[in-house]
Amino acid sequence: AVDALQVAESLDLVAEECSPFQDIANNPAKELALVLAEATPLVWGGSVLAARASRRVAEQLRAASGRAALAADASELCTVVAEVPRRDLFADPFVDPTSTARPAVIVLDDGDETDEVGHDLRMLENTARDHEVRVWRTTHARGSVMERYVGLLHTGRFGAAYLRIALGHDLD
């Protein structure tokens, strides 16, 4: 059975962590918005509920930025990341701006330490590193499965709201 009080307390903690009054160094939602300011989000969650949260977060990021966002299994994201062209160290973004933003892998970690999730995470992180794609992770590993789910979901939703503000869009 889900303990509604515990879930509500988890939501309160996320609201405190992601408060506009929190410095960016201590605010995972603001950090997420900065990571995605000029990036295309590729969102991954390893467990069933983290994967569900990743789809919801991707929807929020897509709505906030007007850009494509993808939530998928690690193997599918690795295929996308493997096709990312290498960075040109000598490219001048002001002279030759690229038409598409580089991707950033967003990992929603609910503390699931099964072998399959660990393998998928390592595969995704290694592929991203090999192709110079940034990886950003948020973790909510304490509490019940539902508490971890809402922690990941709402950190992503706060991040999407900050991204929307940073990009100059109204919060309608």
Task: Name each region found by the language model.
Residues A1-E16, P20-D172:
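A SIS-like phosphosugar-recognition module
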